[in-house]
Amino acid sequence: GSAIGPVDRVVSSPLRRVLQTAEAFGRPVVVDDRWIELDFGSLEGTPVTAVPAATWEAWRNDLGWAPSGGESHRQLGERVRPACEELSEVAGVEDVVVVSHVSPIKAALAWSLGVGEEIVWRCHLATGSVTVIAIGAFGPVLRGFNDVSHLGERR
């Protein structure tokens, strides 16, 4: 929690490794399934280097494309945007931390910048990094992205 400061509410993906991080804030954790990682379907567990080039091309060129049994980036954005909107309603009243995964955080980034999901292919997000989205008088403002300074030597 020291990399972020005091928080009023902690929201987390239901996956165990993320919940463990969320619990480190010492606050009750609200589990919200909308913050779970993108469903990679038939590609789940496949090393990035083993994914065929044609698959990458299809994925990058069509935000509606999804691996068999999985979820598209468009679907992910449709899932994450309402969660962002709900959290923005408590801005100014509560400081909220969301502990999630790379893809949903990138979807939240797209929401905050008012751009489409194509941004997911144009930014890198490190595991354990901190991204800060503040809600100002005119809506969401990206205040920090992919900060890993708190990880020190562990990075």
Map each language-model feature to its residues.
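Alpha-helix N-cap/helix-start capping motif
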Residues: 15-19, 102-103, 127
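A glycine-rich beta-strand to alpha-helix segment
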Residues: 91-108
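Short beta-strand scaffold positions
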Residues: 12-13, 78, 99-100
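Amphipathic, non-transmembrane alpha-helical scaffold segments
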Residues: 15, 73, 77-81
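Acidic, low-complexity terminal tails and accessory targeting/binding regions
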Residues: 31, 38-50, 89-94, 111-155
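Active-site signature of alpha/beta-hydrolase-fold catalytic machinery across serine-
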Residues: 24, 107-111
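Phosphate-coordination/substrate-recognition cap region in phosphate-metabolizing enzymes
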Residues: 1-57
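Short glycine/proline- and acidic residue-enriched helix-loop micro-motifs
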Residues: 55-75
